[in-house]
């Protein structure tokens, strides 16, 4: 089920499979829904804290239940490849690494009962001390090994200058099916002794994980500037814009919805049938690149007043048992598995 209020929930259909990593954002417990981690000042940006800046990340999620669950959280420091590091808590955290989630509210007048939970990082109990990759894990008080949900975030220090250029004139075609990225990284203030070999650069296309690129070395170095150009890893398929849909009401069909039906005990949003666009001309559409926002047409408090509905997707294409179709976006947590 998808929360009624998932407005501008952008969809991108992909025909390839991807295994889910153990440290990816996800909800192993099927009762946990609508997991989000955002900077409230930049809700469509990546989950990033600037060390010592006063930035805050807000974590919000629902648990399908009529009763409150006693939940706790912890932070895991990770290496560049998102594997857990060997640092002890006191080396990367100020405060206590395990805390109780006490901010919760019950859903109001919804067919599907749920409890909405909120948490902020940093808070009065804990704050990151080091830049790097972090994993926030949520688990029941009675069983710390049973992770119900986890989400990635990053803590950064602005020690390098980064400039980039995206071009449609690429090493393989011109204004056709690819885009090529060039990067320049000024390391003069970084304090890195050997930036040519010691910097690990990760590039994502609109937050996607399936084609994420990790660069170990630049093409060349000019003074203190690392130059990444004409590198095959930075050549991306251009693709199309994400598909958009809204499920903000059960009283009328919102954007992208063909009909709304009630089939006891749930409302169903039947989306308009879509089709593959790989062979179609590119059409610009202002989307949020797979992000979603919780909203409900008649509510001023959608976090607890928006209902969950069943959303029916359909893709008009010849059947091929060798092709798997996935929905990509933040609402599927960028995972290509049985839930997407």
Residue spans of the language-model regions?
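Long, internal scaffold/assembly segments composed of regular secondary structure
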Residues: 195-280
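Aromatic-rich carbohydrate-binding modules that target alpha-glucans
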Residues: 93-117, 209-218, 312-340
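Contiguous beta-strand segments within globular domains
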Residues: 28-77, 174-187, 300-313
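Ligand-binding face of N-terminal immunoglobulin V-set domains in extracellular IgSF glycoproteins
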Residues: 111-141
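Bacterial Sec-dependent N-terminal signal peptides
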Residues: 1-23
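Low-complexity, Pro/Ser/Thr- and charge-rich linker/hinge segments at domain boundaries
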Residues: 155-178
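Basic K/R-rich, polyanion-interacting modules in nucleoproteins and related proteins
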Residues: 273-321
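Aromatic sugar-binding surface patches on proteins
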Residues: 100-103, 108-122, 222-244, 339-340
